[in-house]
Design a protein with these regions (language model features):
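Short beta-strand segments that buttress and anchor functional surface loops
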Residues: 116-123
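Beta-strand-rich recognition/accessory modules
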Residues: 21-34, 39-43, 199-289
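Extended amphipathic alpha-helical segments with heptad-repeat/coiled-coil character used for oligomerization
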Residues: 184-192
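Acidic (Asp/Glu-rich), glycine- and aromatic
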Residues: 135-177
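Acidic-aromatic substrate-binding/catalytic surfaces of carbohydrate-active enzymes
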Residues: 26-105, 113-116
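Hydrophobic/aromatic beta-strand elements that line small-molecule binding cavities or substrate pockets
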Residues: 128-132
């Protein structure tokens, strides 16, 4: 199995376009208090996030970011760093911009006020457009997924973030403002399974707050947002499709914005997180198909 995974990864590198092949194995990007790392082995999805020098989103082998799907009848996911099936995400184009100028990164970290990555790729039968931008200490991400034929799926995930196991508490807030507040238990269960726009994490030791806001979804009757409480991470992901058909000619859009704050008083962290969510909840109108 290990040989099969290694062969699939090496083959995927030969299939990369010249622009992507010019990128080093890892790219470090810094803007304000945020540092992210992109890795070739994860198809240049984000693979690590730090804030003020603190690790907040992990880069362990099974901690995947980005987009992944599982076709009906398959035990394996495809996309991002998943290579279990031997069928990996294939990067078609990759562009990186620092303060508006396109750059080809080297071994040194790149820094700027505004950093943007644009990527197109294929995942199984899907065409994926992905972009992220780091500006004003906020990470904004947008994913567009389309298919030329009907696809029967078990799951289609996007906006995945494996937040670090350091986080002790969570606060999930729905569209009406109702809160679900609790402590993580690392019991492999999900703290949330419905679509809600506001997810918040808190680390009592450091006082770090992470807030992510997902734009309303208008795709799929089974769309939802998950918060998986594991020992290795506290993972957030948007499920665009679950046990349903992804119709040909349609485009699914996932938009997520992430910000950070600090509050050492644990009695005040939820109110601070709510305030941060209001700042993050600024999305342009969704594109008409």
């Amino acid at each position: 199995m290990l040989k099969k995974r290694t062969l699939a990864f090496l083959l995927s590198l030969f299939l990369l376009p010249l622009m992507a092949a010019e990128f080093p194995k890892s790219v470090v990007l810094e803007s304000g208090s945020i540092k992210v790392r992109l890795d070739a082995k994860k198809m240049w999805n984000i693979n690590r996030i730090e804030w003020r020098g603190e690790l907040v989103c992990v880069d362990t082998p099974w901690a995947h970011y980005g987009t992944a799907c599982r076709l009906k009848g398959s035990p394996h996911f495809i996309g991002s760093g998943h290579n279990e099936s031997g069928n990996m995400e294939k990067v078609d184009t990759l562009k990186l911009f620092v303060d508006g100028a396109e750059v080809v990164p080297g071994e040194s970290a790149l820094s700027g006020k505004v950093i943007r990555l644009e990527k197109t790729s294929s995942i199984a039968v899907f065409q994926v457009k992905y972009a992220f931008e780091i500006k004003d200490d906020i990470i904004s991400e947008e994913t567009e997924v389309s298919a030329s034929e009907d696809v029967q799926l078990q799951q289609l995930y996007c906006g995945m973030h494996p937040w670090a196991p350091r986080f002790t508490d969570y606060c999930v807030i729905d569209q009406r403002g109702k809160k679900n507040i609790g402590s993580f238990r690392a019991d492999e269960d999900h703290r949330n399974r419905n679509f809600v726009p506001y997810f918040n994490w808190y680390d009592r030791k450091s006082g770090i707050i992470v807030s992510t806001v997902a734009a309303p979804l208008s795709f799929g009757k089974n769309s939802r947002r998950m918060l998986w409480d594991r020992k290795i991470y506290k993972k957030d992901y948007v499920c665009l499709v679950m046990n349903d058909v992804f119709p040909a000619g349609k485009t699914a859009v996932c938009r997520v914005r992430t910000g950070f704050s600090k509050q050492e008083d644990a009695q005040k962290w939820v109110s601070d997180a709510e305030a941060l969510c209001k700042v993050l909840d600024q999305f342009p109108a969704e594109k008409a198909e």
